[in-house]
Each structure stands twice: as structure tokens, then as C-alpha cells.
């Protein structure tokens, strides 16, 4: 399989986890996903009162500078770790 196909499959598989991962795990996965699909963050930081939006922005911003390919590899690795931990 190609890297893109592996990434797409991992993105589908994490939606099927038997239980919800911890918030930190979800934020890391989100940041890697956005970096894989879009690249470096291209939106302004949300207002302080938008806690969920700010957390997502920060998770994506942490991945800034990572190439899309490296982000995909990291996403796949994290997805496999979560699948092993939580099952599908």
C-alpha cells in the first residue's frame, strides 16, 4: 500500500475504536491529521473563551514544520498505537 492509502486506512480505523482515547491522545492525532492533510497551520489562534478550538489549534501548531509525509507516518504510528491500546 502507498503512504496515502495507509494514512486513509488509519484515519478510518481510529473512528472504530472500542473506547474513547484520552484527550491528549486525541489532540495529538488531530494535530498530525491536520498537518498531514493541510500542512503548517494557516489560521489564527481562536479566542481564549473557545477552549476546544484553542486546544485543537495548539495541537496542530505543535506539528508545525513537519512535512506532510512525516506527519502521515507519525499519524499512522499513533493510530496503530491507539488501535492496539483500545481495540477496534
From Swiss-Prot:
Pfam families on file: ACBP
Keywords, in A-Z order: Lipid-binding
A GO biological process held by the record: leptin-mediated signaling pathway
Family that this chain belongs to: Belongs to the ACBD7 family.
Any GO MF annotation of the entry: fatty-acyl-CoA binding
Described function: Binds medium- and long-chain acyl-CoA esters.
Keyword Iron: no
Official protein name in the record: Acyl-CoA-binding domain-containing protein 7
Binding site residues for an acyl-CoA: 15, 30-34, 56, 75
Occurrences of domain ACB (ranges): 3-88
Amino acid at each position: 500500500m502507498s503512504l496515502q492509502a495507509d494514512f486513509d486506512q488509519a484515519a478510518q480505523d481510529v473512528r472504530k475504536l472500542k473506547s474513547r482515547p484520552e484527550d491528549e491522545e486525541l489532540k495529538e492525532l488531530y494535530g498530525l491529521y491536520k498537518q498531514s492533510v493541510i500542512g503548517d497551520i494557516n489560521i489564527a489562534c481562536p479566542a481564549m473563551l473557545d477552549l476546544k478550538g484553542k486546544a485543537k489549534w495548539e495541537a496542530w501548531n505543535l506539528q508545525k514544520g513537519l512535512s506532510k509525509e512525516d506527519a502521515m507516518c507519525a499519524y499512522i504510528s499513533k493510530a496503530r498505537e491507539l488501535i492496539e491500546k483500545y481495540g477496534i
